[in-house]
Amino acid sequence: MQAMLKQTFDPLQKTSYTVLSVTGLSGGPGELPIFRDLALQLPAGVSALLGDEGVGKTSLMRLLSGDLVATSGQLRLASRVAPLSLPQPSAVFWIDLRLPLHDSDTPAHCWAQLRSSLPAWSDATQNELIEALQLAPHLDKRLNMLSTGSRRKVGLVAALASGATVTLLDQPFVSLDQPSIRSLQAFLAQWGQNTERAWLIADYEKPAHLPLVSVLQL
């Protein structure tokens, strides 16, 4: 079954700078592509990718980031055109927020590994998020010792400190405590005013208290 994508834009953001545009995207996690000849645009600011369980939200994010290799497609990022295959993580960043490959790592070790391929990594953002998400007591613990929520916070710090031109966040509010949810909403609302970067949030419903420049519905 192939997925269909519908995109709507905030009419007040008509002149918003297009950070990422994709045409002719085909691919999926199996032999049969769930996306065929897909097109989308991400304006500067925060957008949402909505859909039920199993419709392809994560697969689409993996295709956009190159974590899953597309069978065809073209990506235009900040006016640079390239085939849709393995974009640099510093350009389009996605990570599984559960961090399944980092069980034995501490948060600091995990971030150090990731930042080696992220030249725009922000130490200031990392430190702000450690405080805002209340991660300081857990920095010396291995990830397999952390709760689901704390572990996902480590992934969120990596994604948001990455400095990527386009940051893809797969259900970022799952398993977070309410103070952390409010802190994350505030950070995204602030960063969403950036005129040259884009954030895409995948979830079942529109994120609360966040102005969105566009909504993509699967």
Annotated model-derived regions:
Residues 161-165:
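A short, proline-enriched helix->beta-strand linker immediately N-terminal to the Walker B motif
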Residues 156:
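Hydrophobic anchor residue at the start of the ABC signature
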Residues 123-138:
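Conserved ABC ATPase "signature" region
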Residues 142-151:
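Conserved ABC ATPase signature
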Residues 50-53:
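The feature captures the beta-strand-to-loop junction immediately N-terminal to the Walker
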